[in-house]
A protein has these predicted regions:
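Beta-lactam-recognizing serine transpeptidase/beta-lactamase-like catalytic domain environment
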Residues: 2-6, 81, 212-225, 271-350, ...
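Extracytoplasmic
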Residues: 65-68, 75, 83-86, 130, ...
Length: 776
């Protein structure tokens, strides 16, 4: 009995011990498995996204499919910016190593095809820390074909061609600041490319494929394609022909007047706000946007670079020179990319008088018979300094029309006093001078105008700001602000919102967005607008802007000459540099187009009087002579205008002399007869040549004229009679443009055919006449 009890107790002990052992084992097992469990939890739950992504990257390859960027067109569907297909070449060093490729041989071959240093390519291929090493950028189809053939011939794994696109600007420098450019990442920078990047860019696609343990693609195992979306195309209001005409005449003016700091200009529809042309010169080529286009600036930068590179690398002089060079290069690039028409404020000078007079007439502060007197200078109440008119001898007695025609500062100071600071400020505000225009381009500024108190609280601040402001001095606005404001003066009093993009189309040609003219607010009454149109036209017919005349067109406008009062030389002295400008409008019976041309810092070495009337007015006149016929504005010639009318000669041979003379008379031409007989056998000018109205045509009867060439004389500085005599002596004709007054002070300032050029007898030479006497 006792033995059985002991046996039972032993078994019970063994059972309890066993349970304890099992429990301890379970606990130890749990403790041992805990890190593994936590690790599994981390892998499968906490960091699931990370490891899933890592596995996906190891098992798949993603290739980017670049979206085609949309095109940019002018209003006539001429392509201003487009994209062409190119390819990038990249190496996968890891893949090259896995495939045991002959790296030196690959480097030599690619170096030869791409024109790159083989040693550099070999270094890229050896960098196994990276899976993507680009060795060729935007190569053409022919070069890509050579690389593709090499890959296939050698069976190489690790060299890849990546399709992409390259932006191309067919018109090169034309409207460069408006169109803008794209950077190396194909993102829009500057101009329309930047402002409408979200439309133009489209969306990038991708192809995802699996890859095996040898890093080769396995497209039949798995492939996922996310298509790209082609960018939308943008149609501008810009007209490439009008833009080219504007830039041509601005370039000619820069050369003619030795302009030191470039020029800017604008052509706008004053009824709608559409921009037909917008130019900043000097310009740049967006195909090579990092290259400095101005030769003088480029030479200075090269010299800076040469100087610092001559210093020991790492020395203080080297580092300082390198920094200075980098800053100068960056500043030069930003300057050539800058659209001055919307981004830079300038003192508008006397062009602003149009707004001051409009305001004064509109509110009744003056009328057309308000008298003024200019003696050349006057001590205006509330001004510390004596006010001077641009004409030192004064204009004498004048009324409101003459005040504008003469661009008289003294008269406008008194107009401002009659208008008063409160009304002056409110009208200026209404004209949009204190706000951005809202144009659909990036980088617009709004200029800098007076604080309201400076012009309204004359008891405290005097009248200097009010009176100087009346003729466009001591404040700054942008060229576009000025043009928009003056447009409202002549279009019936409607301030328009200017715009550069007329329509956006998707890849299928569907309209995504279409712009419409937008009236911001009214500025003056229709009656005041009608009056101002008459006054503005009289500035060209009788005032300081006679040099802007174009035969057959009714043109109005206002000249401006402003000092750059915030520019100082290296000694801290204020320079005497000027910006000369002219705003022209046509046709004045129903204004449609407004054109601004401004020349920044004409040289004093040319001997030509620096003023808007002498320099900018004929520049705008030349633009109008080019673009108004193209834009469909009808010409109407009076007897006085005939010398500026171009008549295309018909073929008169075979006609009777009587019939030929009758036809010429109908065209406003006369005839001289050479030879005898009844039938015309030859003529000078030849058929198809142009001849000015009122000219004499030489008809040959019974004989044929021998072809004759003559050298074009230098007409520069000749008056109308002298030029006519010189041309007639050589059998040439002259087409008169610009100032058509017959006086000794009106002389030739430009000719369309260079002196000593050989041309056929009977050729018409276009001469620009201008009065170079002192004019505002």
């Amino acid at each position: 009995m006792g033995r059985k009890k002991r046996e039972f107790n032993r078994l019970r002990l063994d059972s309890g011990q066993h349970r304890r052992i099992m429990l301890v084992s379970a606990l130890l097992g749990a403790l041992a498995f805990l890190p593994v469990g936590l690790r599994l939890y981390s892998l499968m739950v906490t960091n699931y996204d990370y490891y899933s992504s890592l596995a996906l990257r190891n098992q798949t390859r993603t290739t980017t499919v670049t979206a085609d960027r949309g095109d940019i067109f002018d209003r006539n569907m001429n392509i201003l910016a487009t994209s062409v297909s190119v390819e990038n070449v990249y190496l996968d060093p890891h893949e090259l190593k896995q495939s045991r490729a002959d790296i030196p041989e690959i480097a030599r071959t690619l170096g030869e095809i791409l024109g790159k240093d083989p040693t550099w390519i070999e270094e890229q291929a050896a960098d196994i820390r990276r899976r993507y090493k680009q060795v060729g950028t935007r190569i053409d189809e022919e070069t890509a074909g050579k690389i593709r053939d090499y890959i296939n011939e050698k069976g190489i794994s690790g060299i890849h061609l990546e399709p992409t696109s390259q932006r191309v600007y067919p018109y090169e420098t034309l409207a460069a600041q408006v169109v803008g450019f794209t950077n190396a990442s194909n993102e829009g920078c500057e101009g329309v490319e930047a402002a409408y990047n979200s439309f133009l860019a489209g969306s990038t696609g991708r192809v995802i494929t699996t890859k095996g343990n040898n890093e080769m693609d396995m497209p039949f195992s798995y492939e996922n394609y996310v298509s790209s979306r082609q960018g939308d195309s943008v149609i501008l209001t810009l007209d490439a022909t009008v833009q080219a005409c504007l830039e041509k005449q601005l370039s000619a003016a820069i050369a003619r007047y030795d302009v030191q700091n470039g020029a800017f200009g604008l052509v706008m529809n004053c009824k709608t706000g559409e921009i037909l042309a917008m130019a900043t010169l000097g310009s740049y080529d967006p195909n090579n946007y990092l290259e400095i286009a101005d030769e003088g600036t480029a030479a200075q930068l090269e010299e800076m670079k040469r100087v610092y590179l001559a210093e020991p690398e790492g020395s203080e002089a080297y580092e300082a020179g390198k920094t200075a060079y980098g800053e100068a290069l960056s500043a030069a690039r930003l300057k050539q990319w800058r659209n001055r028409v919307i981004s830079d404020g300038y003192e508008p000078g006397s062009t602003f008088k149009v707004l001051t007079m409009s305001a004064a007439l509109d509110c009744g502060a003056i009328d057309l018979n308000t008298p003024f007197h200019c003696s050349g200078s006057e001590q205006i109440p509330g001004r510390a300094q004596r006010l001077h008119c641009w004409r030192s001898t004064g204009h004498g007695a004048e009324k409101t029309p003459q005040a504008l025609q003469n661009s008289c500062n003294i008269a406008f100071a008194h107009i401002a006093l009659k208008l008063g600071g409160e009304r002056f400020y409110e009208y200026v505000k209404n004209f949009g001078v204190l706000e951005k225009t809202g144009i659909d381009l990036a980088g617009e500024s709004k200029g800098v105008f007076f604080d309201k108190a400076l012009v309204t609280d004359t008891d405290k601040w005097g009248t200097a700001s009010l009176t100087s402001g009346s003729f466009g001095q001591t404040f700054k606005i942008t060229p576009l602000q000025l043009v928009r404001a003056i447009s409202s003066v002549v279009n019936g009093g409607q301030l328009m919102e200017p715009y550069i993009v007329s329509e956006i189309l998707d890849a299928d040609g569907n309209t995504v967005m279409k712009a419409e003219p937008t009236v911001v607010r009214g500025t003056i009454s229709q009656e005041t607008s009608d009056t101002m149109r008459t006054l503005i036209e009289s500035v060209v017919t009788e005032g300081t802007a006679k040099n802007a005349k174009v035969a057959g067109f009714s043109i109005g406008g206002k000249t401006g000459t402003s000092e750059k009062i915030d520019v100082f030389d290296e000694n801290g002295q204020r320079v005497q540099d000027k910006i000369v400008s002219f705003v022209g409008i046509a046709p004045m019976d129903d204004p449609e187009y407004i054109i601004l041309a401004a020349l920044d810092t004409p040289s004093r070495t040319t001997g030509i009087y620096i003023s808007g009337g002498v320099m900018a007015a004929p520049t705008v006149g030349a633009v109008m002579a080019d673009v108004l016929p193209y834009l469909g504005v009808k010409q109407s010639f009076s007897e006085d205008d005939l010398a500026g009318k171009q008549i295309v000669m018909e073929d008169l041979t075979g006609m009777t002399a009587k019939d030929a003379q009758a036809l010429l008379k109908k065209e406003g031409l006369t005839a001289a007869i050479s030879g005898s007989g009844e039938t015309v056998t030859g003529q000078i000018p030849s058929p198809g040549q142009t001849v000015p109205g009122g000219s004499q045509v030489l008809l040959f009867l019974g004989q044929t004229p021998e072809p004759e060439t003559v050298k074009v004389p230098d007409f520069y500085g000749m008056n109308r009679q002298q030029a006519s005599d010189a041309a007639g002596a050589l059998g040439l004709y002259i087409l008169v443009t610009g100032n058509d007054e017959i006086s000794t002070g009106v002389t030739v300032t430009a000719q369309n055919v260079a002196k000593d050029t050989e041309v056929p007898a009977g050729t018409t030479i276009t001469l620009v006449f201008a009065d170079t006497a002192a004019r505002d």
